[in-house]
Curated annotation (Swiss-Prot):
Catalyzes the oxidation of 5,10-methylenetetrahydrofolate to 5,10-methenyltetrahydrofolate and then the hydrolysis of 5,10-methenyltetrahydrofolate to 10-formyltetrahydrofolate. It comes from Francisella tularensis subsp. novicida (strain U112). Keywords: Amino-acid biosynthesis, Histidine biosynthesis, Hydrolase, Methionine biosynthesis, Multifunctional enzyme, NADP, One-carbon metabolism, Oxidoreductase, Purine biosynthesis. This is Bifunctional protein FolD. Its EC number is 1.5.1.5, 3.5.4.9. Gene3D superfamilies: Leucine Dehydrogenase, chain A, domain 1, NAD(P)-binding Rossmann-like Domain.
Length: 282
């Protein structure tokens, strides 16, 4: 069994990116810049954004965090985004979710200039993903999953891939990326009947449902590749959506939780920020 080590791979990829960013800055005198916006005082949001700031510094990308009070109105937030859209020194914009209930998430996402939409959530980028447009900014977690498969030499062409979970953030975009990579793809969700009949056929099984140890050994094919996107807190520990202890000896390769997909998400955010800077300054 191969352990797909996202932490180690992420470190290698950041080192590669740091070299590319340094060369880019030397050749263009442009420093890629990410602006992250937090609305309110959600502790998890602050932790996530702090880790993104730290990662930016590691590769030579400028970052700025704008923290707005909980009572910020939607129109005030949209006005700020408009200013950032028109600021040529800002290449990438991230609005940390969740937002307070009085702010419409979609209105906010749709207001970000597609070329600065570092999370890849804007409908333009969703459409570009479908069309395999090279200018597409791919959603960070799905992009990280595909990078893991590629870097570990896991063949997608002709493979049967099953994605459990159909969210806009992970399930749908990773299904599309797998399709683009010439896999045959089935996307399962809460209305799927007889889930096991699908998962036991998967050469590549990707799970993103937010339910601890949801996928058990009897649901996985011998020799499959398993990517566990879940992050769940159980008895003070972080566990995935896959019963790792039971499944690991049955599969060819598997990601751990923590230390699997998570670190790759932030690394791909850095790569997307660099892509934004390059595209905006062509």
């Amino acid at each position: 069994m191969i352990l797909i080590d996202g932490k180690s791979l992420s470190k290698d990829l950041k080192e590669r990116l740091a070299t590319q960013v340094q060369e880019y800055k030397h050749n263009t005198a442009i420093t890629p810049k990410l602006v992250a916006i937090i609305v309110g005082n959600d502790p998890a949001s602050k932790t996530y954004v702090a880790s993104k700031e730290k990662a930016c510094a590691q590769v030579g990308i400028d970052s700025q965090v704008i923290t707005l009070p909980e009572h910020t109105t939607e129109s005030e937030l949209l006005e700020l985004i408009d200013q950032l859209n028109n600021d040529s020194s800002v290449h990438a914009i991230l609005v940390q979710l969740p937002l307070p209930a009085h702010i419409n998430k979609n209105n906010v996402i749709y207001s970000i200039k597609p070329e600065k939409d570092v999370d890849g959530f804007h409908p333009t980028n969703v459409g570009r993903l479908q069309l395999r447009d090279k200018k597409c900014l791919e959603s960070c977690t799905p992009k990280g999953i595909m990078t893991m498969l590629r870097e570990y030499g896991i063949k997608t062409e002709g493979a049967y891939a099953v994605v459990v979970g159909a969210s806009n953030v992970v399930g749908k975009p990773v299904s599309q990326l797998l399709l683009n990579a010439k896999a045959t793809v089935t996307t399962c969700h809460r209305f799927t009947t007889d889930l096991k009949s699908h998962t036991t056929k998967a050469d590549i099984l990707i799970v993103a449902v937010g339910k601890p140890n949801f996928i058990t050994a009897d649901m996985v094919k011998e020799g499959a590749v398993v990517i566990d996107v879940g992050i769940n807190h159980v008895d003070g520990k972080i566990v995935g959506d896959v019963d790792f202890a039971a499944v690991k000896d049955k599969v060819a390769a598997i990601t751990p939780v923590p230390g699997g997909v998570g670190p790759m998400t932030i690394t791909e955010l850095l790569y997307n920020t660099f892509q934004c800077a390059q595209e905006l300054n062509r």
